Amino acid sequence: MDEYKHIETCVGRYIAAQYLHAVEVGIGRNPDAARIVSDAGKLLCSTDVRQMPVPEDITFFVDDVFSPDISRYRKADVIYAIRPAIEMIPPMIELAQKVDCDLVVCHLGFESWGDGGEKIDCGVILHRYYRGQNPSNRVD
């Protein structure tokens, strides 16, 4: 399996198995993880700072985590991102805290922010930087 697609597959399967209402931040031009989560019926939406060519059946919004539209994230039990720029981590943590949901990040290589958060091995290493305090919507 192509390593690039392996990462998205692992992340998508993990998010779909562990959560009910997910938002992907920074979808870019790679909707593979969002596709897996969406096919499981668990993707609320995907976002990026610019308009992106995502499949029509994946709900997409232009949004910037540095000044997010909180309404896009309110129902989420997880916000996740694949290979975000490291400077995006603090505002994503703040966003997850505001809406009280988990924040799960798959970094590029061995990057991490701060203490690296809670590490999760789902075939690739994920970092849970914030765990929502009201897990009523969480599968696990």
Predicted regions and their residues:
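Conserved SAM-binding loop of SAM-dependent methyltransferases across substrates and taxa
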Residues: 29-40
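A short acidic, Gly/Pro-enriched loop at the edge of an enzyme's catalytic core
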Residues: 70-78
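Conserved SAM-binding motif I beta-strand of class I
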Residues: 43-48
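Conserved class I S-adenosyl-L-methionine
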Residues: 19-29
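Conserved SAM-binding strand-loop segment of SAM-dependent methyltransferases
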Residues: 56-68
